[in-house]
């Protein structure tokens, strides 16, 4: 993207500082490593008591620049230093691919460590984390800064050691899972994360936007009748188009009146929306999503009788990841493979809410300006476009738009064939495995040798990408495979025009198109890019616009069938409009997810805060007597004029509180006593029993029981919130705002959760026996 006025203003301001940093290159030239480490210690100590000035920044950057020159032989150029200064302001730096973002990260991490902050560097995958830790980590270590790599599969002791480092490399999911696991421990000493000071996110658009739709989940197996999925599959397979309504771009499908009647008859229920039919309704809706919204070889792939999710932004399969809330099981039933047990959520957080907990956040990527509004609204981060060190030498052509996919396919083969014959390497980008395999078949038929990269063979990704810049190589890849790694050109390829990039479809986001184009023309290399699309592509087929429907029908009817592109201004404008609308719809989905998660987020923070206090104090924050009194009063004291059916609820609660406990008065006697007298008897008896225990022992027992019950009830509450979330959109058709209803009913469920674990804690207190154990 081009710089706007604000970007130019910021860059101009920082260019002068960057030039001063370069001028300081002689300052540390004659110092040995020990002296450079002394400088590091000097700056660390200084900023414990004093603020950092621009002059300090210049000297610190110059120190890091000297170390990088010595250790990895790279001298940071002015634009890299400008980018690092932008990152230091808590912004997103958009820097073209191949311009040296990895080296840029060194400076902002080093300066944040000097400020006394612990730094987390987040990358898209463990391979990149390991690679960058080795390259930049050695420079930081040379300067006396400790560096660690946060990997999955480590034990608590190893994790604790990692989190003592000044700079920690890792993936978003691993840092997020560590946070969730920390809030499931039973002892304070088992927590590993030590403060969320500063996070620098590489490929920020991918992590903060693309991955934001998928929450992080820790789960275990959930008991469920899996045969219902196969049964519901039979129903959905028989459904006709007039049984349901669908908004595919919003990923939403629902039964209309005809469909409801058919489903009720199939399940043998009077009402599909009755409490008794909740499981049948839920699983029917899941199977409808699986059949009508989830597409094989686009959203998922079936390999070795297993359903694997396809990352929509990279085209990679994600082994070990499953769609949550029963959708994965529904797809398994649809595809006729083994339906595996659904997981039950133990802890969850969205990427957005995890990273918003850091005191300071910065990001770097090759493409972010198109999503600046989202970065601002959700993360409070501006995006600044950093100029390139060398002029971009890539030729970006206008799209060729064809009437049909068949015509498009022929044109792509022709375009690739003449480039192949002259030896120019070509990268062909597709948006799905299906499209990838279709183009591959056309190339095979034309006798053009090529290598294929998609979710089915992504294990060979590094090897395939390494060959993509070789003379005469044709590479066919889904989306952004190989992102984060360079396609290096053979020396003789430059005179042939560099790497040619052919896009076969416009993606859901202009940003992903720009990423594909950005594979070519790196660091001043020559290059070429062009999109070859058709009126039958998903983007235009699903575009809902009356004027476009009329124009599309007219164009297809009058198509000359000569295989030439349409290429009218009007159609190019439609493509841009369709893409912008889809971007807006996807942004709304992410905002929607965040709005719903903010309800859980507030509840989660309250629960985790109480947990932390329990672990810190090693005893309850309030007296057990106070909790018992409140529960007893809630159970026994009620208005004298309450209806008979509500009175039954009170009796039931009283029986549950006292049933199976050591309380010496029988329930028959209790019913004859004054309710306030019962409360006092319960409290005084518990007090007497409690005093039989040593103070430390009883405090430890109460804390353990309270913590255990809170954790158990929290898991049940999360499950209830999932069920509420799944059904809440049905309210939209009852003239009620589903989000408002979710907030209201979610708050009621949270109050119930708190009341429940207090109730069962009170019950447990009455089960204390003289040996100091909790029975039952």
Curated annotation (Swiss-Prot):
Residue sites binding ATP per the record: 80, 98-102, 486
Name of the top EC class for this enzyme: translocase
Keyword tRNA processing annotated: no
Subcellular compartments: Cell membrane; Cytoplasm
Matches recorded under Pfam families: P-loop_SecA, SecA_DEAD, SecA_PP_bind, SecA_SW
Keyword set, alphabetical order: ATP-binding, Cell membrane, Cytoplasm, Membrane, Nucleotide-binding, Protein transport, Translocase, Translocation, Transport
Reactions listed under catalytic activity: ATP + H2O + cellular proteinSide 1 = ADP + phosphate + cellular proteinSide 2
EC number: 7.4.2.8
CDD domains xrefs: DEXDc_SecA (cd17928), SF2_C_secA (cd18803)
Gene3D superfamilies: Helical scaffold and wing domains of SecA, P-loop containing nucleotide triphosphate hydrolases, SecA, preprotein cross-linking domain
Cross-referenced SMART domains: SecA_DEAD, SecA_PP_bind
Record membrane topology: Peripheral membrane protein
GO BP annotations listed: intracellular protein transmembrane transport; protein import; protein targeting; protein transport by the Sec complex
Assembly mode: Monomer and homodimer. Part of the essential Sec protein translocation apparatus which comprises SecA, SecYEG and auxiliary proteins SecDF. Other proteins may also be involved.
HAMAP family in alphabetical order: SecA (MF_01382)
Protein name in UniProt: Protein translocase subunit SecA 2
Organism encoding this protein: Listeria monocytogenes serotype 4b (strain F2365)
